[in-house]
Amino acid sequence: DETPNMWTFIMLDSYTGKNWQVQFSTKGTDYMFAVPINYLCKAYPSSSDRWEGRFKMFATQNMWTFIMLDSFTGRLWQVQYDTRSLDNLLCVSINEEVLETGDRSIFSIQPMTSMYQYYLINNESGAMWQFQWTTQGPDYRWIKRIN
């Protein structure tokens, strides 16, 4: 996914949920790299699974932060990249609970007025949750059902 920095991108494996920060440069290969943001798969497909596009990334108004959605289950993660320090790369759970099980994309997200809050929507049932990401720590990261 594209970031506001023309030399830095987030590469997403939409099949497993793994993602990397990719850096390009005109200064040569010493300044180019790809580093994992999260090392572990968020889903483990079998060879017969057809999960194309299962995971989706959404840019937030914060240039360093994306929301990753498992559109099959409703699970959410806050993904953060950094151009100054690789120690600041982050992929943390907003919602570990599997809200639905299935083999197709049924969830989407929509921003609210606050840059930190979104709606998670089950496009089949109409069920909705409100969730929040944060830079302040896990106590400020939450999700709640609203209907």
Give names to the regions the model predicted.
Residues 22-23, 79-80, 131-132:
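Tandem-repeat architecture and repeat-register "anchor" residues
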Residues 7-14, 64-72, 117-123:
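Short beta-strand motif characteristic of blades in beta-propeller domains
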Residues 1-3, 46-60, 99-113:
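Beta-propeller blade-edge signature
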Residues 15-19, 26-28, 73-76, 127:
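Primarily extracytoplasmic ectodomains and periplasmic/lumenal surface modules that are beta-strand-rich
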Residues 1-5, 11, 26-29:
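Ordered, small/hydrophobic-rich secondary-structure cores
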Residues 26-51, 82-103, 134-147:
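Trp- and S/T/G-rich repeat-edge/linker motifs of beta-rich repeat architectures
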Residues 125-135:
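Short, exposed beta-strand-loop hairpins at the edges of beta-sheets
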Residues 20, 42, 57-60, 65:
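A general "mature secreted/periplasmic domain" signal
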